[in-house]
UniProtKB/Swiss-Prot annotation:
Signal peptide limits: 1-17
Group of enzyme by EC: hydrolase
Chain spans, region Disordered: 428-450
Subcellular locations according to the entry: Spore wall
Name of this chain's protein: Probable glycosidase CRR1
Organism this protein belongs to: Eremothecium gossypii (strain ATCC 10895 / CBS 109.51 / FGSC 9923 / NRRL Y-1056) (Yeast)
Claim: Signal is one of the keywords in the record: yes
Function: Spore specific glycosidase involved in spore wall assembly during sporulation. May be involved in copper import.
Originating gene: CRR1
């Protein structure tokens, strides 16, 4: 179901008021294993549409793009290091085991608002977007779109999450609100960096009502996935699942009871993922474990185990809509009652509320080389040029697995316009489009929604 989450939300989340995003193929071009993107629109988005610019950055699928190089390498979130001294080893670096990202979405004291990132955003940003920027979130079409390396470095430093849909901040608690006003496609936030093994903890309240789905997902650009899904009519239950390289095997889903109502009470939902096993945890208690050894496919002679760099995504989306497949509607508990749902009547939208997110990256096979390169970098570069690592792929006979995963310290991670790509990072704007800024939809003002 999580693949459907992304398609439902993000194929249409920006296309409002008859606006067609100039970075998406027009007319629409779908990408799949059977049909890769054309040279003119080379990047296959996570949601199955060909395009350029933003679609080449976050979630760009190298499997179905024109070529793997069409996708920009993705910045990595690495394990935190600490300096250790001992009598036998001397002074050395060691992984601290501390989170590399912790946020309660409060304003950052060091925030530097960037009024304009690129040419298409010539009209600046809204007051809401400025507030979200100061809390470490940036609108999806604007992330890493700039012709200025200095601005790109500031974005990497400032922004923890990319957002789309109806995002706002609770005026009392300052928790982040994922909103879904009447007959819309909901909201999504995605971590701006990826990690290859790690632990993520999300403290949140889910939305409620038949047809309403809240989800916490680890998602890789090659479609490995680990998730939690919450059906809004089953507030004492959570579903867990995983997928390997986009293979839609729904037999792996499991249901688990929750200690209390997921809409009324905050719970901490965690995924603890390493090279050999996955733990799903609720409020510190393990509810499910998957071992890599149990995912062996004797036919293809591979482990069907998630093992590519993941971003963390948290979303709210409508499964119970008249145009959804009947099986999806039944799974979601029926159709959404857009007119009489209590939260629609009281607050103007359905909503999930996120209080805190923490991500702790783990060790992986690349870390020894990365740490060695880090030491060499520090000896040759100034503090103004921080050490950055990004992941990218080369094809392995159509399969994208750790054997073809590459890491870079010198990759260009930004594009100069909405029409640039990983192969042509400084491409100018297409002549058939006029410059304009993408409309940002303001969420209704919400205070103390839950």
């Amino acid at each position: 179901m999580s693949k459907r989450i992304i398609q439902l939300i993000l194929l249409s989340a920006f296309a409002r008021a008859n606006y067609v995003e100039p970075f998406k193929s027009n007319p629409y071009i779908a990408c799949s294993e059977a049909s890769h993107c054309p040279k003119e629109w080379p990047c296959c988005s996570q949601y199955g549409q060909c395009g350029s610019g933003p679609l080449c950055i976050s979630g760009c699928n190298p499997k179905f793009s024109h070529s793997p190089e069409s996708c920009v390498p993705v910045p990595a979130l690495l394990p935190q290091l600490e300096i250790v001294a001992s009598d036998d080893k001397g002074v050395y670096l060691e992984m601290s085991g501390q989170p590399a990202l912790v946020t309660k979405f409060q304003r950052k004291s060091s925030a530097q608002l960037l009024e304009v990132h690129h040419e298409e955003q010539q009209y600046g940003v809204s007051a809401l977007e400025q507030d979200l920027n100061s809390r470490g979130l940036i609108h999806f079409p604007d992330y890493m779109i700039t012709s200025k390396p200095k601005v790109a470095r500031e974005m990497l430093e400032q922004y923890d999450f990319i957002h789309s849909g109806f995002i706002s901040v609770d005026g009392k608690s300052e928790s982040l609100i994922l909103g879904m006003p009447k007959k819309t496609t909901g909201s999504l936030i995605s971590s701006s960096k990826v990690f290859l093994y790690g632990r993520a903890a999300v403290t949140m309240k889910t939305s409620r009502g038949p047809g309403v789905i809240t989800a916490i997902v680890f998602m890789s650009s090659t479609q490995d996935e680990i998730d939690y899904e919450f059906v809004g009519s089953e507030l004492h239950t959570v579903q867990t699942n995983y997928y390997y390289q986009g293979e839609l095997n729904h037999s792996r889903m499991r249901r688990h009871s929750l200690p209390s109502n997921s809409h009324e009470e905050y719970h901490i939902y965690e995924v603890d993922w390493d090279a050999e096993r996955i733990h799903w945890m609720v409020d510190g208690e393990i509810v499910r474990t998957l071992y890599k050894r149990d995912t062996w496919d004797p036919v293809h002679k591979i482990y069907k185990y998630p093992q590519t760099p993941m971003m963390l995504q948290i979303s709210l989306w409508p499964a119970g809509t008249p145009d959804a497949p009947q099986g999806t509607i039944e799974w979601a508990g029926g159709l959404i009652d857009w007119e009489n749902a209590p939260d629609i009547k009281a607050h103007g939208q359905l909503a999930a509320q996120i209080q805190r997110v923490a991500i702790t990256p783990y060790n992986n096979d690349f870390c020894p080389e990365i740490h060695e390169s880090m030491g060499q970098w520090g000896a040759q570069n100034s503090e103004e040029e921080p050490f950055r690592v990004a992941y990218g792929y080369e094809s392995n006979n159509g399969r994208f697995d750790p054997k073809k995963l590459k890491w870079y310290t010198d990759a260009r991670l930004h594009l100069s316009s909405w029409h640039a790509t990983g192969i042509k990072p400084t491409a100018a704007q297409r002549q058939q489009h006029h410059r304009r800024s993408l409309p940002h939809v303001e969420a209704p003002p919400i205070t103390n929604t839950m």
